[in-house]
Amino acid sequence: MSGVRTLLEKSGYSEKAIEYYEKMLNVGEIKDPDAHFAYTGPCGDTMEMFLRIESHIITDAKFRAIGCAGSYASASALTEMIKGKTVEEAEKLDEQDILNHLGKIPAPKIHCACLAKRTLQEAIKQYKETRQ
């Protein structure tokens, strides 16, 4: 068991949240994305989200972040959750959906799910504004 994994477990992260953090799913950039937004949360973590949208369905989602394990786990989970969903379905997801999907993260890190959701909301808003 790695030292980081042990620290995350002791801090209160679920096995699923730790796996999302360790695997770093969807970390990266989409060239010429249909939607893109970067946001810095009140904690100082910065997240950037890239979406590929075809026929109003999110076919790919990636992110980059400067942040903690909670931010990476939340964004990894959210980008997995929205793939294959319509833009409207993705918009309806909230922080609690992300937290439920992750299982458990420490209470002081709940804002990380808010950061991921806010970044997604703003990317979708930008997408809609450019499509009008």
Model-derived regions, located:
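Domain-level signature for proteins that mediate thiol-based redox and metal-cofactor handling
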Residues: 1-132
